[in-house]
Swiss-Prot record:
Name this protein carries in UniProt: Ent-kaurene oxidase P450-4
One Gene Ontology term of the molecular function aspect: heme binding
Upregulating conditions: Highly expressed under conditions of Gibberellins (GAs) production, whereas the transcript level is very low in the growth phase.
Pathway: Plant hormone biosynthesis; gibberellin biosynthesis
Single Gene Ontology BP annotation: gibberellin biosynthetic process
Length: 500
């Protein structure tokens, strides 16, 4: 047999084995004895259901919630099965101790943390300690700092506009750049926040991580060491990591003494043992930047789309901002008095959450729930938070949950009995967009302030509208994530004195 034919047979044999192996992996399933949703028929293979979940995840989860609202079910997605816990089980589940569940591990699994450099988050919770103990208590004093950087960012990132000219913009990209600059100020302080290498690295890192993680999710573990180096996104990610370590290392070595009020300095102060290593700190800073920039930017983009689709909210929101700022300027309490703006962001998030499933956990001990359901060790669970927020049982106010009511929550909070409830940053067993319990998103208070500040300044300085003849851009659902359409555009013009 000619040598070429032998090589061809080897390639065919390897390809056939690889296909069969991938199908075998995609066809495997968990041992949890609860209903599975999503199959079109009894004849549909599991591997096809897992693939369909990529673009039909939202409808599959919604179907399961509507059918099994008060009982447990599961969905099959690429890489894992997820047991979906209904609201009436949440308090029982959340009381489990950290040694039984891991909240960060699902993220590491979804995005191939071994290759995307996310494993550092499994080593300790340094980043959470810093956010909870240092950042959150300082939020009121950071308002003016964040506003200073936002004012500067707008001069760099918004297009030049003349007179009454409307300019079409990619608001999604603008939001990423604005939030990147504000976050860099809080993360690195005034001396280093405009480091272009860091700004570029954090923007690229998130994109390369998501692409690499998503591709490797469908690759069997045994083949990942061989496939990962072939991916352009993985090579970009490695460059991003190297760049991030270099920037953070240079900053750490240049800093003298203590007293800096930024996350990097707080992280250095709080670190113990191996946490003190520069590479360790740099990697945590990169992942924190990813979390703080891109989820916030997507939430803000959704809010801008909603605002332009419902322009009747623009003037009431602008009037509120002008009233608060006119009374006392951008003092420490200004953001807390934006009640309508807070409500609008919360309602926008209710319709357009970044994550359809929250409260993600992986159990590392087998346990039995009160109804007798056994949860084996290694099981992943989540809550259908988006589906819940379309259910009248979990959405307050007289307006039906299917209708967008931007002031839904501010109207309820006008009653003094509910003044401190239904805030954008608050979580409870009915609204888990930011998670719930001890392991709710630790940065949600910072993110809330950042978004309220950004939207308030945009309302004061600019006019926005949808392009003529266009409706609100449709969301894109990928797996269990919901993203604003990055191809959509908005029209913007600078406000003038005559607009006052």
């Amino acid at each position: 047999m000619p040598l070429m034919d032998v090589h061809w047979l080897i390639y065919v044999a390897f390809g056939a084995w690889l296909c069969s192996y991938v199908i075998h992996v995609l066809s495997s399933s968990s041992t949890v004895k609860v209903p599975v949703v999503g199959y079109r028929s009894v004849f549909e293979p599991t591997w096809l259901l897992r693939l369909r979940f990529v673009w039909e995840g939202g409808s599959i989860i919604g179907q399961g919630y509507n059918k099994f609202k008060d009982s447990i079910f599961q969905v099959r997605k690429l890489g894992t099965d997820i047991v979906i816990i209904p609201p009436n089980y949440i308090d029982e589940v959340r009381k489990l101790s950290q040694d039984k569940t891991r909240s960060v591990e699902p993220f590491i699994n979804d995005f191939a943390g071994q290759y995307t450099r996310g494993m550092v988050f499994l080593q300790s919770d340094l980043q959470n300690r810093v956010i909870q103990q240092r950042l959150t208590p300082k939020l009121v004093s950071l308002t003016k700092v964040m506003k200073e950087e936002l004012d500067y960012a707008l001069t760099k990132e918004m297009p030049d506009m003349k007179n009454d000219e409307w300019v079409e913009v990619d608001i999604s990209s603008i939001m990423v750049r604005l939030i990147s600059r504000i976050s860099a100020r809080v993360f690195l302080g005034p001396e280093h926040c405009r480091n272009q290498e860091w700004l570029t690295t954090t923007a690229e890192y998130s994109e390369s991580l998501f692409i690499t993680g998503f591709i490797l999710r469908v690759v069997p573990h045994i083949l990942r060491p061989f496939i990962a180096p072939l991916l352009p996104s993985y090579r970009t990610l490695l460059r991003n990591v190297s760049s991030g370590r270099r920037v953070i290392g240079d900053i750490i070595r240049s800093q003298q003494g203590d007293g800096n009020e930024d996350i990097l300095s707080w992280m250095r102060d709080a670190a113990t043992g191996e946490e003190k290593q520069i590479d360790n700190i740099a990697q945590r800073m990169l992942i924190l930047s990813l979390a703080s920039i891109h989820t916030t930017a997507m939430t803000m983009t959704h809010a801008m789309y909603d605002l332009c689709a419902c322009p009747e909210y623009i003037e009431p929101l602008r009037d509120e901002v002008k009233s608060v700022v006119g009374a006392s300027g951008w003092d420490k309490t200004a953001l807390n008095r934006f009640h309508k703006l807070d409500s609008f962001l919360k309602e926008s998030q209710r319709f357009n959450p970044v994550f359809l499933l929250t409260f993600n956990r992986i159990y590392h001990q087998s346990m039995t729930l009160s109804d007798g359901t056994n949860i084996p060790s290694g099981t992943r669970i989540a809550v259908p938070s988006h589906a819940m927020l379309q259910d009248s049982a979990h959405v307050p106010g007289p307006t039906p949950p299917t209708e967008f009511d931007g002031f839904r929550y501010s109207k309820i909070r006008s009653d003094s009995n509910y003044a401190q409830k239904y805030l954008f940053s608050m979580t409870d067993s009915s609204n888990m967009a930011f998670g719930y319990g001890k392991y709710a998103c630790p940065g949600r208070f910072y993110a809330s302030n950042e978004m309220k500040l950004t939207l308030a300044i945009l309302l004061l300085q600019f006019e926005f509208k949808l392009p003529d003849g266009k409706g609100r851009p449709r969301n894109i659902t990928i797996d269990s994530d919901m993203i604003p359409d990055p191809r959509a555009r908005l029209c913007v013009r600078k406000r003038s004195l005559r607009d006052e």
